[in-house]
């Protein structure tokens, strides 16, 4: 072991090359790593959705849900499943057994569901997908004084423009009703023209199609023939010929029917700060960068706002990268502070060159860990950043111990290279043992099962990678850089105030060691059994305080949030008016609570508020129905208000009472 340490310590050029490669590799890895708020992973669930327009829950239960349950019986890899029958929709959520291949189970479920031939004729094609933890990056609100159709058209336009931006592929619109063309024909009209409703439906169906007509090949080119006949507006549908009478007169759909070009009857309504609104939610895929998406959306908004009518407002209601940016900023700030503290304290007690190279352990360790994460295909997210912040104060410990040991051997008058080798060899095994115990302590986190295990799986990787690189750097690179320390006995004392401060600090430390620490250590060794009993008693006391509840314990503490959401869900079939009344009540209750916590300048702690009836938050995945409603508030940053978000929630529950 000592020969290996000596070989590295003697080869300064090689150490410098490795150092540069680690720093450059870490920097490049950081630039290529994707950034996201939380890691994406499979939750081992499969979703089955079958739309059945116009059906009530009983019809959905009989025609859709029971057929799904029959199809799922006997499929290997399924732990359990739950089914739901709602208006216009039947669905099932399948839990996959832990350890089973989700892709294989998904294929089996798809083939079984697609093989069902007894679904109602009016039912749409089943949609079978794997459920993933999809994260929204940004949510925009479009509001203003305009008709519902104008709002919908403009929102659709903005949605498509955002989807066309670089690095963005998933954009959804919610809070607005879908288009619908209704055709109403009275029985009197049908009798008058001697036609049935089925004939009218068939005429509409057959006359609103895009058909492929084949290919015409010539010597010079190939021409593809396609008949474009699909109708998209009420005016186009009104021109469809339904019947030709004996006199050759053409009876068009507009002659016998009332055609309304409008929206579905779903009672969806949404507001932002009291104005009618539609919402555009931007998601990320596993191949996209959250911060890049958020910045791109912000630039688009800034350019688009000037092109909109004066009374139309496009604003970012929610920025999902705010916490991620804050965590990155915290890591950067803590890194600089740690580097500065290590540099200053080691310079104060030991040597300037030693303080520099020991402090370099922080960027080297983080850079090496970044490269390992990039090589493993991981991302920079809240969990990995938490790991970096947690390990930031540990990675430099071994470098400090090695550096101090080399400094001590050099102060004895040994040649620089021998002092470096003897110094690192003396503390190598204790350092390896100390770092190994920390690594082993984090290894069990890699074996936690379920969703929580997948959620935090990156944490032990970050910590252990950082510790491994730090250990390797302190044993093999640091001695090479400290193998040129000058003879400390021949160093002339400086006369500057900083030199006086350094000598005074060193003298104070030596006095503390000789007069306080050494006598205390001698007493502890002499009366070791008493000190051991005292240590064990202190440990038992600490455990007892936690077990007795005197010291509170929380796995995840309640942090102050800038976002408060209150959701209501009534039994299916509840009228939208009842849901809206409950949502209005929650909104007014929170406005009253917030009014009592205005800032010192009299400013409200609420920046924005959203109200949604007929659809849950989350867009297409959340579900629709008149029994669903939500109200959401964006608060001022925590440093600008004097009340915690949890206290506001408690006050809201008391003010709103039982719904």
PLM segments and residue spans:
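Signature of alpha-helical transmembrane segments and their immediate interfacial
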Residues: 1-35, 427, 496-554
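Interfacial segments of transmembrane alpha-helices in multi-pass membrane proteins
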Residues: 2, 6-16, 286-289, 325-381, ...
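Surface-exposed amphipathic alpha-helical segments in non-transmembrane regions
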Residues: 16, 23-32, 63-80, 95-179, ...
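Transmembrane helices with small-residue packing motifs
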Residues: 20-56, 114-123, 378, 446-455, ...
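Hydrophobic transmembrane alpha-helices and their membrane-interface caps
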Residues: 26-32, 37, 340-407, 465
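Juxtamembrane "pre-transmembrane" interface segments
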Residues: 152, 172-176, 184, 255-257, ...
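Helix-loop junctions and hydrophobic alpha-helical segments within the transmembrane domains
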Residues: 317, 324, 328, 403, ...
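Hydrophobic, glycine/alanine-rich multi-pass transmembrane helices and their short helix-loop junctions
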Residues: 344-349, 368-383, 432-484, 544, ...
